[in-house]
From Swiss-Prot:
Annotated transmembrane regions: 6-26, 60-80, 89-109
Name of the featured protein: NADH-quinone oxidoreductase subunit A 2
GO function terms (MF aspect): NADH dehydrogenase (ubiquinone) activity; NADH:ubiquinone reductase (non-electrogenic) activity; quinone binding
PANTHER family in the record: NADH-UBIQUINONE OXIDOREDUCTASE CHAIN 3
Source taxonomy: Bacteria, Pseudomonadati, Pseudomonadota, Alphaproteobacteria, Hyphomicrobiales
Protein species of origin: Rhizobium meliloti (strain 1021)
Length: 121
């Protein structure tokens, strides 16, 4: 394929970026700007926030598990197509996937040793 065949795609991407930037710029000019403290306060079911949620930081352990889930889901996305074409790619493909899985395993072991999977503080 030549570079000229990608020219319409370049125009389309450029147009999309320009329209998005123009929309954000115009909306920032037109919207009212009236900051007040109540706007930034946490709101839950019409009740005043109390305790740690009233402005302090609190620990949410679920985000680490969510990140690990995404990482290993991406691994599975690479692993299934690799298993389908294993005979065609041969030994080199096997070694590449082994290195990929080894790197993920090292990262998982690091997270485990650092206590990222522990629920108690």
């Amino acid at each position: 394929m030549t570079a000229m065949e990608f020219l319409p795609v370049l125009f389309m991407v450029t147009g999309i970026v320009l329209v998005a930037a123009a929309t954000l710029f115009v909306s920032s000019l037109l919207r009212p700007s009236n900051p007040y403290p109540e706007k930034n306060a946490p709101y839950e079911c019409g009740m005043e926030a109390a305790g740690e949620a009233a402005g302090g930081r609190f620990r949410v352990p679920f985000f680490i598990l969510a990140i690990l889930l995404v990482v290993f889901d991406v691994e599975a996305m690479f692993l299934f197509p690799w298993a389908v074409v294993l005979k065609e790619i041969g030994f080199v493909g096997y070694i590449e996937m082994f290195v990929f899985m080894l790197l993920l395993l090292v990262g998982f072991a690091y997270a485990w040793l650092k206590g990222a999977l522990e629920w108690q503080e």
